[in-house]
Structure formats: C-alpha cells, structure tokens
UniProtKB/Swiss-Prot annotation:
One of its GO terms (biological process) is cell division. It is found in: Periplasm. InterPro entries: 6-blade_b-propeller_TolB-like, PD40, Tol-Pal_TolB, TolB_N. It comes from the Bacteria. This is Tol-Pal system protein TolB. Part of the Tol-Pal system, which plays a role in outer membrane invagination during cell division and is important for maintaining outer membrane integrity. It holds the Pfam family TolB_N. The keyword Transport does not apply. It comes from Shewanella baltica (strain OS223).
Length: 442
C-alpha cells in the first residue's frame, strides 16, 4: 500500500472537487485488435449501495491502455460472483477471454472498506478443467485484499489495473500516474492555466493562472515538482513548483529566451535553452545553486533538450544542418551527432524510459505527426495521422504517448500507443489544451 498511500497524499493536496473528468477520452482507433478480458462488477457485501464501482475504473483503465478489450458483462456466463472459489471453469469455455478480474467489497468499520480481488487465468483454467476437477489456486494469477476509505476507491481501482496489466503483459501499469498541461481560455481575464490531473483527466487541479502565456511543463523524476516557463512578469522565466507545498522557485531569468526545461534523471538539474549569449543554446542549470554550464556552442538555433535515462547524454533540436533535426550530445566529451534523417523536419524528441526508442515530431510532405525511431535499427514509424501534432510526452512505462494536436480548429490533447495501433483524443470541456507532460510513476 506504500505506492497507493504516496499517490493519495498528492491527490488529497491537489483535489478540491469531486472526481470528474476535465478531459474526455474519445477512443478513435485500436479497440477491435485488443486482447479480450473479462471484468466482473465487484460484489457488494453490505447494506444499501456500494460507495463506488471499482470495476468500472478497472475496465476504463484497461480499455485506455490500448492493450485490452473488456467484454460486455451481459455476455458473461456467470453473474454475481466475487471470488475464485465461485468460479466454474467449464462455464467459460466459449468466452474467448484470456483472464477474469472479480472481487468483493464490504464495510470494515467507520468509513473503511475491505476490498478483495482475484485475477484468474481463463486459458489455464479451461485447459486444466479438461483434465478433471481443479482447485482455484491452480489458475489464480493474483489474489489480494486491502482496507481503504471511501475516498480511495478510484485510486485503488487504478492500483488493481496496474496489477492486472503487469501480470498479463510483464510491463508495469501506468494508471496511478498524472498529467500536466496548459489550458487556454480567452473568455477569462487570466486565460492561461497550468493544470494537473489524473492520467485519465479526472481530479483536475489548477496550479497557476496567468494573463500571460505558460508553457513547457515537465515533471521531476520523483513526481513531486513541476518545472515550466512563465511570461507572467512580461518575459520568459523558468520556475520550479513543489506540488505538495505549492512553493515556487524562480530558477532562470536571464535576458532573452529562458525555455524548454527538462529535469535531469537525478532531479538536481535542468537542461534548458538560453539565448543570453546570442543564439539559443543548450545549458544545464543546478536547481539549488543556480550554477550553469553551457553544453552547445553553434551559430544555429539549439533548443528542446531532453535527457537520456542514464543522464550521460542529451538530445536536442537544432537547425545546424539547415532544417530542424534532432542531435545527441555526450555530456562528458561534448561530442555531437545527428540522430534523425528521414522527412523534412524532426523535432521535440524524447527517449523512452527503456532507452531503446526516441519519440518526436516528424514533418513529411508538410504534415506534422508523432513518430518513433528504434535507436538500434534506426527504423522510423509514423504513429499518428492527426493534424499539427506537437509536444509528445511518453508514459513512464513507455507504452503510450500523449501529445498536442489540432481537431476541428482547436488545440486538444491526444494519445497514441508506441506501436501506433491505439489512438484516442482528449478534448477539454472548456478552452484549448496544449503542452502535455506525463508524470513518472508515483
């Protein structure tokens, strides 16, 4: 429960309104090819109605992962079962799902509830059933129970989703994560708003409102701080804000451009873009001491730094070849090498958490789309077909990318799986949305 408790501490500090999605999630492609899974409503073992439907959270998470497709509850062969002991393997032979999630919820003191869930391997259960009677332990992939409060139902639903996803894919789930983004609503006197929400757009909280532009939010590796660019003082400045204490620290306010902050893997420094010495160049600034080190030195524009996971190199966008392309600089030697060659432009790059791929914006035939390049084979795959894509940010498990795009003339957020198969759009209820950033694991 340590992970859930840490996440809840942040959620309580940030959330001042009931759980509600500020960003809708409209899935546009990829569900039909997903892996079928059964998620049954958790059986309520108390008086009246259950506080919340945990199974609904789990089903929504699994759909949004792009990997799984929960089956319609009405077509499931058993109803109102909450434990593996009630599961009848022979009844599920024609369902076609690979796993079943089921559970129970019951009161456990004042504002406390005991939540239990089981994850059943349906394929293994059916194969074993053909050989004769089997015990539940032979096909049980996971079984847990936890005491939570009513306020923790949604978060624990995300935790169950994380467990199920990892058990079935071998990849850590990223459902207990958050996103930051900028909302622009010109009907308000201070139209620029820096927001934080759960990964699915629920529990949105405003961190800052300004009459001047806000841009480029990025998370610290521990998920405790955000760095961003603000023009609130009529010039570009970089701030770091603690999400727990709300304390803001001005990190960079040099003449000219102060932009594109990116936390180092140890969280102690920021890679930033400064133009204080002429052309925009890449620098590293120590957050505590404000000491800076210049990394690039070229007459062309260098911007949009991003760290390799090992902290030994940066990638950045540069026009030193005539058009925007992505380059790598080794911090120990200063050696610079060009990384991208396909298409007209390539910019806004970031390395996936496993260090194997790069996600970036590719322009080909005048169209801006999100692309992925395998760093070992150099094979590039265009992932999206939306318009004017920008600002890609990778989920901490490397399976999904959130990015800004244009839909029906408005700036919105969208998501695409890193294999390009699953796609979704995240329109806001009010205003336009841009500059998304996905948190680390929390």
């Amino acid at each position: 429960m340590r992970i859930l408790a840490k996440w809840l501490a942040l959620a309580v500090l940030l959330c001042t309104t009931p759980a509600k999605a500020a960003l809708d999630i409209v899935i546009t492609e990829g569900v039909d090819a997903a892996r079928p899974i059964a998620v049954m409503p958790f059986v309520w073992q108390g008086p009246g109605a259950a506080p919340q439907a945990i199974a609904d959270v789990v089903m929504s998470d699994l759909v949004r992962s792009g990997t799984f497709k929960p089956l319609d509850e009405l077509g499931l062969p058993q109803r109102n079962i909450g434990t593996a002991a009630q599961f009848q393997a022979n009844s599920w032979s024609s369902v076609g799902a690979e796993a079943l999630v089921l559970g129970t919820v019951k009161p456990y003191g004042t504002d406390q509830y005991l939540v239990s869930f089981d994850l059943i391997d349906l394929v293994k259960a059916q194969n074993q059933a053909l050989k004769g009677p089997v015990s539940a332990t032979e096909f049980l992939m996971d079984s847990r129970q936890t005491v939570i409060s009513a306020a923790q139902f949604r978060q624990y639903g995300h935790r169950i989703s994380d467990i199920v996803y990892e058990k079935l894919t071998g990849i850590r789930g990223a459902f207990l994560t958050r996103i930051s983004y900028v909302v622009v609503n010109h009907t308000q006197k201070a139209p620029y708003q820096l927001m934080v929400a759960d990964y699915d757009g629920v529990n949105e909280q405003m961190l800052l409102r300004s009459p001047e532009p806000l841009m480029s939010p990025t998370w610290s590796p521990d998920g405790r701080r955000l760095a961003y660019v603000s023009f609130e003082n009529k010039k570009a400045e970089i701030f770091v804000q603690d999400l727990y204490t709300q304390v803001r620290t001005k990190v960079s306010s040099f003449p000219g451009i102060n932009g594109a902050p990116a936390f180092s893997p140890d969280g102690k420094s920021l890679a930033i873009t400064l133009s204080k010495d002429g052309q925009p160049e890449i620098y590293i600034i120590d957050i505590a001491t404000k000491a800076i080190k210049r990394i690039t030195n070229h007459y062309a524009i260098d911007t949009e730094p991003s760290w390799y996971p090992d902290g030994k190199s940066l990638i950045f966008t540069s026009e030193r070849g005539g058009r925007p392309q992505i380059y790598r600089v080794e911090l120990s030697s200063g050696k610079v090498s060009r990384e991208t060659f396909e298409g007209e432009w390539n910019l806004g790059g970031s390395i996936t958490p496993d260090g194997r791929s790069m996600i970036f914006v590719n322009r080909t035939n005048g169209k801006f789309n999100i692309a992925r390049m395998d760093l070992s084979t150099r094979f590039m795959q265009v992932l999206t077909s939306t318009r004017l894509d920008e600002s890609p940010s990778v989920a901490p498990n490397g399976t999904m990318v959130i990015y800004g795009t244009t839909y029906q003339g408005k700036q919105v957020l969208a998501a695409v799986s890193t294999d390009g198969r699953f796609k979704a759009r995240l329109p806001a209820g009010q205003g336009e949305v841009k500059s998304p950033s996905w948190s680390p694991f929390l």
